[in-house]
Amino acid sequence: MSSILVEGGKSLRGEINISGAKNAALPIIVASLLSSKTLVINNVPQLSDVSDMLFILKSCGVHVEIVGSGTIALTANNISGHFSPPCNIVKKMRASIWILAPLLLRLGQVRIASPGGCAIGQRRIDLHLAALKAFGANIQLEDDYISANCSSRMHGISFKFDKVSVGATITAIMCAVLANGSTKLANCAQEPEIADLCYCLRKMGANITGIGTANISIIGVKELNGANYSIIPDRIEAGTYMVAAAITQGKIKLNNVIFKHLKSAITKLRLSGAIIQYQNENSLIIEGANIIKPLNIQTNPYPKFPTDLQAQFMSLMSIADGVSIITENIYENRYMHVFELIKMGANIVIQSREAVVTGVKKLHGADVIATDLRASVSLVLAGLSAVGITKVKRMHHLDRGYESLVEKLQNCNARVQRIPD
């Protein structure tokens, strides 16, 4: 366990290189299980979630080689039914559910612990299991374990998701690429990270059309090849540092970004008064306004405003000149950071899924506790703008999704340091 000390009141100025997207890296790493050939992945962020997923794959018999900085080579030519993914890691990682489909396709049977992750609402796995069953899998739930088997090759299906789900869309895509026949998936999540997975699978030999849309068509192939693939930059990390500039009235240049992935965040930041300029194909400069204007924000599936930036924008709205309304439509329990922001002087009232944020002139440093990944960084952002020193505890959450955050902030003259508890 460790904490981060933040001394606020300093405008951030500098340049930050955005890392590879965690939410693309994890499913692409898992996709290596679909082939016996080597998959080389570039632009892989150094995060605890990535390390945990690689550890799970090693336990399944995958050969993992660190080729260089941000590059790994995965070869799943020696997996068998005699594997034992570590329960403690599987249970704490929601993304571990994705290993079910490829292992079932390769081995015909699999048994893993039920997955975990951030304690945010009812992140259920029923949509994943419904998709697996539709493809022909037999599923049994017993004592916090999931057992699955398939007596023959999975078959192509026409399937419409009851609700938009990033995770379940990924599970279904991985089933379909090796299933017998054609698959049509409707009401798919359209996140860029899903498209990135599809482009990687296509490079491995998968037959996928409709990438990036709500309707994806896949014709199954008998086997996939190896490939060399680079992960897209992390739009949530980019959005977080954009808020860092806005909340400190600073000026930051971000490199390695994809503008269209940031459209909803850029629109809201401009409405708040920030000035954002595109520099070239993959760089932008954001300059925060002296007076932050209030916003109305509703989280929704991509391409609308992402739930993973809700907490960061709430910190920004805490010092806006007026009243902001933030509505969380994705998860029913993603306001745990609110109580910590209130300790810092924020004026926030929760009404079911809606947060009414009345801006104050200044936040004040306090000892606060991170409850999940995005909450942890929202408290760091609040500390950057606050008067005095903020201590953010339980920063292991941050390590799940932000590569070298302290160092990147320090490069922009932030007074921030990590300390052991």
Swiss-Prot record:
It comes from the Bacteria. InterPro entries: Enolpyruvate_Tfrase_dom (IPR001986), Enolpyruvate_Tfrase_sf (IPR036968), MurA_subfamily (IPR050068), RNA3'P_cycl/enolpyr_Trfase_a/b (IPR013792), UDP_GlcNAc_COvinyl_MurA (IPR005750). It holds the Pfam family EPSP_synthase. Its EC number is 2.5.1.7. Coiled coil: none annotated. GO terms for cellular component: cytoplasm. The modification 2-(S-cysteinyl)pyruvic acid O-phosphothioketal is found at C118. CDD domains: UdpNAET. Phosphoenolpyruvate binds at K22, N23. One of its GO terms (molecular function) is UDP-N-acetylglucosamine 1-carboxyvinyltransferase activity. Pathway: Cell wall biogenesis; peptidoglycan biosynthesis. It is found in: Cytoplasm. Keywords: Cell cycle, Cell division, Cell shape, Cell wall biogenesis/degradation, Cytoplasm, Peptidoglycan synthesis, Pyruvate, Transferase. UDP-N-acetyl-alpha-D-glucosamine binds at R94, K163, V164, S165, V166, D308, I330. It catalyses: phosphoenolpyruvate + UDP-N-acetyl-alpha-D-glucosamine = UDP-N-acetyl-3-O-(1-carboxyvinyl)-alpha-D-glucosamine + phosphate. The active site is at C118 (proton donor). One of its GO terms (biological process) is peptidoglycan biosynthetic process. Cell wall formation. Adds enolpyruvyl to UDP-N-acetylglucosamine. Belongs to the EPSP synthase family. MurA subfamily. This is UDP-N-acetylglucosamine 1-carboxyvinyltransferase. It comes from Orientia tsutsugamushi (strain Boryong). The gene is murA.
